Every structure is written in C-alpha cells, then in structure tokens.
C-alpha cells in the first residue's frame, strides 16, 4: 500500500502562504477522529502519490509518526495549472462501509474502428468496507462495434457481492456512435454537388 507523509498544520497557517512555500493543504477526518486534523503535505510528496493513486484510492497516511489507513476522498486542483492544491482523507474503520468512487479506465480505444467511442461516465459511486475498496475499473473496448453500449450493470464492480453500487446500473459508461454527421455526405449534399 502506498504511504503519504504529512504534517499537522496549525490553524494560524494560511493555505495560500503554505502553497507559495511548496505545500499542499489537506484535512483528515473520520468517525474516530474528533473534529478533523488540518494537514500540510510537501507538494513533491503529493505529486508522487498522485502518479500512482487517484480519488477513491486507499493509502496509508503518516502524520508525524502516526499511521492512518485512509481513503483519498477529495482532491482540488488549480483551474489554470492543474496542479494539486488540497487533498481530503477519510480514516477507514475495519468492517465499516464507506462511500467512495472508482475511476473508469478505458483500454484499447484505438481498436474501435467503426464509429466514434464516447465515454459518458468517468467514475462509479459505491459503498464497501475497507478490505473491498476499488479505486479503478478497467474496461476493454477492443470488441465494441457500432451501436454497442456498456452500462454500469455490465461492469465487474456491479457483480461484486462485497460492493454496493450507488450509481444506477443502467447508466451508460461508454457507447459507439455513428461518426459525426458532418463527415458523411448526405443525399442532399450529393444532389447539390451533381447540380453544380
């Protein structure tokens, strides 16, 4: 399991100032934590963990020597630079279900040769205990043809008895559509070309 190191942040330390100094701010909360713990994380450390993890990933958070089994609950990015600004973590309790999301990753998109592949859903919301958390869902697009659709109900996560899927099972994840109508000459266009 990936480990992220963080430090406690004093309430007097302003987020903007910390970000200028190379930190990402954060919060740790959970049923067994009174209030929440304000955090500061070295930006390089946050970027390292984000290369391997995502929203919904389970990691070990080390705060000044104490380790917490946590879920990456939220991440805020700078709209212009897309650099990470803030991360929120929820402490996990063994045997207790937690709300989370699993990111949908499409594979073999280039194998879809007829039609245009359109992804309509980026993540699936679900509830599970810490030992059954899912941070990503891999979807193979290599066998999709024009008119094919994959719904949440078709995904492995929907068939996992240890996971309660919250997103509607009939929600469309990906579909293969007819290519843009502008690229296909209509009968009227053909008639106009012939008349010229």
Language model segments and positions:
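Acidic, negatively charged sequence tracts
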Residues: 1-196
């Amino acid at each position: 399991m990936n480990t992220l190191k963080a430090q406690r942040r004093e309430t007097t330390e302003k987020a903007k100032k910390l970000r200028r100094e190379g930190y990402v701010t954060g919060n740790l909360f959970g049923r067994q934590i009174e209030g929440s713990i304000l955090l500061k994380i070295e930006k390089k450390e946050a970027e390292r963990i984000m290369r391997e993890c995502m929203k919904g990933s389970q990691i070990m958070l080390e705060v000044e020597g104490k380790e917490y089994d946590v879920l990456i609950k939220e991440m805020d990015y700078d709209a212009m630079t897309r650099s990470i600004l803030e991360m929120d973590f929820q402490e996990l309790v063994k045997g207790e279900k937690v709300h989370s999301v699993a990111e949908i990753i499409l594979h073999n998109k280039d194998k879809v040769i007829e039609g245009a592949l359109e992804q309509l859903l980026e993540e699936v919301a679900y509830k599970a205990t810490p030992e059954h958390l899912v941070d990503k869902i891999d979807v193979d697009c290599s066998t999709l043809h024009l008119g094919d659709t994959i719904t949440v109900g078709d995904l492995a996560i929907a068939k996992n008895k240890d996971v309660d899927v919250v997103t509607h099972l009939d929600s469309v994840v990906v579909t293969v559509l007819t290519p843009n109508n502008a690229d296909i000459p209509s009968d009227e266009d053909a008639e106009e070309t012939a008349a010229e």
